[in-house]
Amino acid sequence: MILLTLLLISSIAIVSAIDTDSSDNQILSVEKSVNQNIFKINHPPENHHELNDLNPTKKSVSKNFDFFGIFDFLFKGEKKYGYWVWSGDMDKVDFDKLSKNGVNVVFLNSYAFKDHGYKDVMNWIKKANDHGIEVHIWMQIFNTGEWISPVKNGTPNTGYFNYKIEEAKYYAGLEGVSGLQMDYIRYEGNAYKDPNGTAAINEFVKNYTKSVKEVNPSLTVSATVMPEANATYYYGQDIPKMGEYVDVIVPMMYKGNYESDSEWTKNTTDWIVKHSGDAKVWVGLQTYQSDFNVTDMPADELLKDGKFAFDNGADGVIYFKWGMNEELDNKKLN
């Protein structure tokens, strides 16, 4: 308690010393940079649109002073570092190396149960846990090889919703599973054609989270989102509303697909954090150049983007995918 009191007193002194004029100039610079950015969608390619409604407000002092990292640690918890792991890569994962490099969470694709069998997957989960690594089951919701509409005959596709929720409840009850990861919780890019689509997705996310937490209240539920201001219009993803239901928002910040740079990563992380409510934000970073150039992203560039993500409010960094840049030294970001 004495330590916290001293920290609070020191923080007040720091806040009072801020140069307001200088801060305002920095904000104008950030606003200009963000509004000049172009968000490009990999598919469908015709859906390119400007990020014209981002208007970041002043960043909190905690993002500008390392001193406040103490508060982040005390109140936000440990930073998360992890990988999405495809079923086909499951047996190749080296937990010794991952643990050594600071990885503490993996998203294992749910098809691993079909491809490897229950026993092998459970042994894999236990091995991960023994290395201090959480396992979250990564589920593909509205795309399992083909797109499935969240709406059927103008109303929520409840039959399909119930099917996926029952599947999720099964995973939620497995020993050693720490979380569930909803991927493809969206439209392909044509949500604007369905006026009930966003509401249907919100209903699914709400019911999914409620149902799995009835099985295991300690589960961490996350949802991947498109890192775009117009995510509702194109994908049916109302990020602020989703943030009311899930524990973690995972924006897919694949800058290569957007033909963007690290400045885009920084500014977009800031926007996502400000629009995710109480949900934590674990930024998804692409381990390769882009979907059009599948060569490794330089390790130092990935770590730089990870630092930008944390500096702008993220609570974790998840790399897509394991098998490329799987030996990143994440401890450099602590």
Descriptions of predicted regions:
Residues 47-98, 223-227, 288, 320:
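Boundary/entry segment of secreted carbohydrate-active catalytic domains
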Residues 82-86, 136-140, 200-236, 279-290:
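Aromatic-lined carbohydrate-recognition surfaces of secreted/lumenal glycan-active proteins
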Residues 108-111, 178, 183, 234-263, ...:
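Aromatic- and acid-rich polysaccharide-binding/catalytic face
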Residues 121-129, 134-175, 300-305:
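Active-site-adjacent "subsite" loops/lids of carbohydrate-active enzymes
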Residues 163-196, 318:
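Active-site groove signature of glycoside hydrolases
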